[in-house]
Amino acid sequence: CPYDCGLCADHEQHSCLAIIEINDQCNLTCPVCFADSSPQRLENKSLAEVEAMLDAIVASEGEPDLVQISGGEPTIHPDIIAILQAAKRRPIRHIMLNTNGIRIAKDVEFAKQLATYAPDFEIYLQFDSFKPEALEHLRGKDLTDTRMKALEHLNMLNLSTTLVVTLQQGVNDDEIGKIIEFA
């Protein structure tokens, strides 16, 4: 709510999803990026700033249903593990990590660290297409092998994963059924 007296006179509104953006830096330069993230954007929120954001969500919600750690690309934040630990120490029912999957694909030990945050933890994995040309258009490079390797690691670790599609008419809209079946 917190007491804005908008839709609910009883102050019972709450956030079903809170998103914390921990950085602006990304290891991709996606043409479709709404966050204006890139490798040149070097800004990272400090651990103290992120903890203050987590505390504000908990103060507002009590026991938040879902907090998504996002960015930029949160897996390249130098304090990502400490940030996830800080989130797990709070009464948050479910934590989601929004990622393009590159680090998970390249670093199985990192993926193993992520798996220690289960069961109330999941990966929100960018997965737009099986077609290299569609990925080039949406993400600026063919990430087919990277996505498959990330999924291999996540499946090996039995880590809950949601595939997230940026859908663009005439680019990958013909694949939505195939992606749903694959998921």
Regions found by a protein language model. Name each.
Residues 1-6:
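Non-catalytic membrane-proximal stalk/linker segments that position and tether the catalytic domains
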